[in-house]
Amino acid sequence: MENIMTLPKIKQVRAWFTGGAIAEKGAGGGDYHDQGANHWIDDHIATPMSKYRDYEQSRQSFGINVLGTLVVEVEAENGQTGFAVSTAGEMGCFIVEKHLNRFIEGKCVSDIKLIHDQMLNATLYYSGSGGLVMNTISCVDLALWDLFGKVVGLPVYKLLGGAVRDEIQFYATGARPDLAKEMGFIGGKMPTHWGPHDGDAGIRKDAAMVADMREKCGEDFWLMLDCWMSQDVNYATKLAHACAPYNLKWIEECLPPQQYEGYRELKHNAPAGMMVTSGEHHGTLQSFRTLSETGIDIMQPDVGWCGGLTTLVEIAAIAKSRGQLVVPHGSSVYSHHAVITFTNTPFSEFLMTSPDCSTMRPQFDPILLNEPVPVNGRIHKSVLDKPGFGVELNRDCNLKRPYSH
């Protein structure tokens, strides 16, 4: 009889944070909205707060960067460690060290689904439909997958069953699709800058932006719009039709997460051939099931916010059963290892974090070391052939551990 590998138990879980409200602006890391001055990601992007003039110009003005980066590290009895990052900051540290630790420590490193289910059910009374608590659970889940991969000496994508393609092709999210085309990406997704409070003038301005980029990028390059929950059905419908002459591939997250009937109506109203997408700010498996039922074309969970890799795999199955694509909101290596195993993810997102979108910069810079970036718009599966998620924690990032147990 062949010997079966004996897996260690988890000795300890630890949580740090960096950045956030008490830090100097521009920490980056897991909270990639926390960028310095003159960055495209904070330049008059339409949001649900844009109707208030005091908060129209900058997303940081209403506090999009107050949470900061959460780092969760799990250590096995044999001394090996796994870690992950997300957006939950000091409050996430409290949840990990004072609540979730009891479900993690003492478990086998392979007990990921058991730990995941216990974390979800134990936080139901204060987690609601996602948000901070789900970000924290996601971070723990990703750290567990990282540890498991390192213990058995395999990349996470092989733990999920292996790659279904040799490489991942990417579109770029940022203010300059024309530069993204030069870098080899298959498409460019731009943020909208105007919303319902701006009336038809706002529609004309954003449509003119799309028209300008279509002229610069040519007919075959994908162009998309990211509306970041800032619209209503009527405005989104008018914007979609205004952009139809410029072959807009999809219009994304026009409505707040729970407006399921609105998404159903928008899909019905959208021009023929234009896709409707959403999911970035949905935080539970149940919400993705309901979102799928609206008939949208692509679901876009963030693996660091939706419940982690364990939930992302389940979301992909829901989408596949309905003939929908799942294209995760850009989350770097944590998405790469998943999407290369999904048959219904033919491409993925890369978020441009350089200030003017002119250079390639790792999304979670500087918190991750050895974080890969696309080359000519692609990442080959061989780049992912390292144990776990294949990245290391940069411990020079002023990490703080405010709680212990």
From Swiss-Prot:
Keyword field: Lyase, Magnesium, Metal-binding
Cofactor note: Binds 1 Mg(2+) ion per subunit.
Catalytic residues, chain numbering: 329 (proton acceptor)
CDD domains associated with the record: MR_like_2
Domain of life where this protein originates: Bacteria
Swiss-Prot/TrEMBL cofactor(s): Mg(2+)
InterPro entries the UniProt entry points to: Enolase-like_C_sf, Enolase-like_N, Enolase_C-like, L-Rhamnon_dehydrat, Mandel_Rmase/mucon_lact_enz_CS, Mandelate_racemase_C, Mandelate_racemase_N_dom, RHMD-like
Name used for this protein in its record: L-rhamnonate dehydratase
Organism: Escherichia coli O1:K1 / APEC
Gene giving rise to this polypeptide: rhmD
